[in-house]
Amino acid sequence: MADWDEIKRLAADFQKAQLSTGLQRLSERNCIEIVRLLIEKGLIDVIYTNDGKEYLTQDHLKQEVKDELYVRGGRVNLIELARVLNVDFGKIEYTAKRLVEKDPNLHLLLGQLIETSYLQRLASEINQKLVQYGEIHIGQLTTTYDLPTDFILNKIVLANLHKVIFAKQDPTNAHIFFTQSYIARNKAKIRGALAAITKPTPISVILNLTDVPARILYMSLNEMSSLGSVTVQSPAGQYIPHVYQRMQAQWVKDYFKQNGHIMYETVTKLGVSDVRSFVQAQLPDEKLVQLKNCIIGNRLIDQVKDSMDMCVTSNSYLDISTILPSSLSDDNIEEILTHILTPTIRKQTYVFGMVVLTVNFMDECVKGCLELVNEHAKRAVESGSYQKYIAEKSIKHQEVDHGVMEEEKADKREERRKKASTGKGGGGAQGRETKTKSTKKHARGTRGNVSDSDDGGEIQTNASNKKGGKDPHIELITAKEIAKVVEKTLEPEGLEMLAKDVANHYFPILSKQALVKAHELYEQSLQKNNQNRRQTHASIQEKLNTLYNDIRLYEKGLKLFPADVQGQLLKYLLKTFGTDACNELCLYVASECNLNTNFNAPLTTEQRTKIANDSGPEYRPHLQTLCKALSASETVEDFLDKTEKTMQACSMMLKKIDKKKDRNLILCHKHGLLEQLTNCTDPALVLHLAVLIIFTISTQTMLHASGRHVSAILTFLQTVLSTDDSKVFNNYHDLVLKLLSTESSTTEEAKANAEDITKQLGELTPVVKNIAGNFKKAGVTPVE
């Protein structure tokens, strides 16, 4: 204590010296030196300011801190305090800690020095906020006052609860405080809102309308459970009032009682999630049938059953849509039919959409199709399309049988190879490993089936699959044709829209009947054809013999000409009579082989070639050779030889040559030419017939030639005609050529020349006819 008194005395002396006159004051440097010495000796304890120009004692610093705390309202930041007092922050912090340790009313928190009076003032402000808003959250206070949450909760709110702060802590959230009046006010809002709601309402909507906190709403809903219930206690949940549930139940009962059914969609719109359970709960005494999207009562089911029984009994039809509510869809009606159609009823009825037709009623509708079936079957046989179908099916069967045989052979070869490779005792391979091919068979496919029209059976083979072709098929009657007949029967009943469905149903049945009928007609036609074929065979044989003899006789006439003319006459003879013979044989073979013979007569070269190539193996080589001979033969004998062989292949006999009959044939040929000449007026044809008549009489042979060969024939006849006759014929021939040349011209001069030539020909024609008609071979007596 004496030291401190001494220090005080020295300080007083120091101050006195400072305030004395200049001669008695110490300099600033001396003062600093004195203070330094005092500090070194430990006689004083002072604190420097930040700029080093001032000194403070600890007590004075404490007092300065308290003064600043008071001035700032009981809360001061240590950093701000160090700046204001111009003292190092560490000294300020140290001083603040000492003050807090000695004074329980002070708090050091987050670098701030806080006095209890400040906390009391905050408590009063918080209470005012509660009075104003009714609710407050510690988190909001933390943001407002920049203080830790726990400090505000424990040191301010809880410490002053029921003293300065009059509120109630939320039991579900310790950081929320509210007043009792606030709770009562919100509950009144909620009660009024819930009482006004008559349909399911989202919790979020109630929260938005009432502006009530969600926790208070959920707390109130639990207390007001008599008004309604909540699906989920979250904004995504819904509040369902009990009055709405009662309305739902009553609506479902009334609707079902009136209509006998109820749609799921309708009940779902009422806000019911589990429709089936809800409806079953509301109608416990009803026998309900659960369908895909509706529930049907037993009353409607019984009504449909009674109508169905009446329909079957009367052999008529029933439109289900006329006895069921219009609100039911086609799928609903189909489900009802599935429910009521017993196996017995199914055998007697067919269902097309919403219409049920009895079997007897449908049979009456398609009676008119039986005549159509017979007509189409007859047409198919007459046109040959059914025969083509039979032939294709036969070929297909042969391919199948061949494929099966090849497969069996392959299986046997594989089996023998397998036995050889795994044979007894160690022999042929000298104990070495022998490689063998895999004997695994590939799976047979299901395509390429062959069907039999008689029994409808199917054969599946691997061979048909390899061919890759479809089964032979013929359609004798179409569903469209059946529909036209059925529509006439259904139209009076107003059911014409079912014609297509009924036709599609009966199409396979009537198609099979048509095939059976076609097969019967085909068998009958085969029997008739066998009889006609024998007659046809004899007729064609006679015709071919006639053509053969004519060609043979004409050959004698053309051989009298020079070689160059012979070639032309031979070509013309084969082109006419030879072609006729070849055509007859081709048509006969086509008929025998069931080939398509719908060709325009006469046959063309391509048609003859096609028939020859498509014919059977017993006919093909001979017919192909004959067709080639028409253009390739150099002599008549060659063509006749091939014709004879082809006739033998067709089982036709060639009659022996009778020379007596040859003379009669030549005579008949001459009389035929004379008759034509008598009735002919065309100059070119008159000349043609006249030279043929003279040639036949003079050579006693027949000649087949065209108009272009007249000149060559006239040259040949120069030796048998008199000079005058030859001159007449040459002149007549020249006039004919001139007339033919002028006919192609349209000039007036050409027309005048044509008239003049025609006039001259008219004068010479009787002369030419007279010469030909009266011509006699020298030394020969005419035969009548």
UniProtKB/Swiss-Prot annotation:
Keyword Oxidoreductase listed: no
GO biological process, one term: reticulophagy
Keyword Zinc: no
Documented EC number(s): 2.3.2.-
Keyword annotations: Transferase, Ubl conjugation pathway
A molecular-function term among this protein's GO annotations: UFM1 transferase activity
Signal peptide boundaries: none
GO cellular component: endoplasmic reticulum membrane
Family annotation (InterPro entries): Ufl1, Ufl1-like_C, Ufl1_dom, Ufl1_N
Biased composition (Basic and acidic residues): 398-414
Residue span of region Disordered: 398-472
Pfam families in the cross-refs: E3_UFM1_ligase, UFL1, UFL1_C
Family: Belongs to the UFL1 family.
Function (record text): E3 UFM1-protein ligase that mediates ufmylation of target proteins.
Protein name per Swiss-Prot or TrEMBL: E3 UFM1-protein ligase 1 homolog
